[in-house]
Amino acid sequence: MAADTPVEYIKHHLTNLTYGKLPEGYERADGSVVQEATWTFARTGQEATDMGFMAIHVDTLGWSIAMGILFLGLFRFVANRVTEGTPSGLQNLIEMTFEFVQGIVRDVFHGKNPLIAPLALTIFVWILLMNILKLIPIDYIPSIAHALGLEYFKIVPTTDPNATFGMSIGVFLLILFYSFKVKGVSGFSKELAFNPFNHWIMIPFNLLLEILALIIKPISLALRLFGNMYAGEVVFILIALLPLWIQWTLNVPWAIFHILVIPLQAFIFTVLTVVYLSAAHEDH
């Protein structure tokens, strides 16, 4: 692996495979100079940073899509082989997951919308599958990628804020959509202006409070998931720096602990999403 010191090793494992645009005249790590602005893969963490906001984390995007396809494929496979007799282990697992998420929606969501349960199921399973990638030993996939010529390669999408913010912004847009659809422009505007203090003189304060509360929802969703998964990833990386005999004594209990953290974070994101959408469906 391209890392000579512990610091370089940590930075290497926390850097995404980044594709972006380097400006004309940019001097790359190998000393070459970009003759004209061009899209390319970053060779160093600094190059990835210099590519700016429009750069794409290819590994995050690829693994996110792969887990989405796996989710759809698993459920399609089981749906086509549903039996009325004794179900298979996979069918049992899918049915338990479905009933679990359905129970969340039944307990938390108080409106009438047939799309909420499928949405909650998609969010829960998708995040769960992305989180499970954390249990793959830290060096396995990056080593294969490095052998294929890819300098950087992260495999856990939820350790990238781009992925968690992407999902939370999607939830935020749904909150706004259903707030306007269910309550109407007038009803939603009144809710912002007259809540929590129902007096015209408090309208500016109410608007400030409610708009901040709206904005905080996607930010807290994204940062909670990212923070927990990123911190766990850092600990796995630090353990990998230790002598092999110490690694096993720490890695196993930390991995067992993460078997609890992985579904818990998917559960929290799903529940909060349903709570926020339930509030958006409440017509005052």
From Swiss-Prot:
Signal sequence annotation: none
Gene3D superfamilies linked: ATP synthase, F0 complex, subunit A
Location in the cell: Cell inner membrane
Main location: membrane
Membrane protein topology class: Multi-pass membrane protein
Keywords: ATP synthesis, Cell inner membrane, Cell membrane, CF(0), Hydrogen ion transport, Ion transport, Membrane, Transmembrane, Transmembrane helix, Transport
GO CC terms, sorted: plasma membrane; proton-transporting ATP synthase complex
Pfam family, one: ATP-synt_A
Keyword Transcription: no
Annotated transmembrane regions: 55-75, 116-136, 165-185, 196-216, 234-254, 255-275
InterPro entries: ATP_syn_F0_a_bact/chloroplast, ATP_synth_F0_asu, ATP_synth_F0_asu_AS, F0_ATP_A_sf
SUPFAM superfamilies, A to Z: F1F0 ATP synthase subunit A
GO molecular function list: proton-transporting ATP synthase activity, rotational mechanism
Known role: Key component of the proton channel; it plays a direct role in the translocation of protons across the membrane.
Subunit structure: F-type ATPases have 2 components, CF(1) - the catalytic core - and CF(0) - the membrane proton channel. CF(1) has five subunits: alpha(3), beta(3), gamma(1), delta(1), epsilon(1). CF(0) has three main subunits: a(1), b(2) and c(9-12). The alpha and beta chains form an alternating ring which encloses part of the gamma chain. CF(1) is attached to CF(0) by a central stalk formed by the gamma and epsilon chains, while a peripheral stalk is formed by the delta and b chains.
Family named by the database record: Belongs to the ATPase A chain family.
Protein's name in the database: ATP synthase subunit a
Protein's organism: Marinobacter nauticus (strain ATCC 700491 / DSM 11845 / VT8)
Gene: atpB
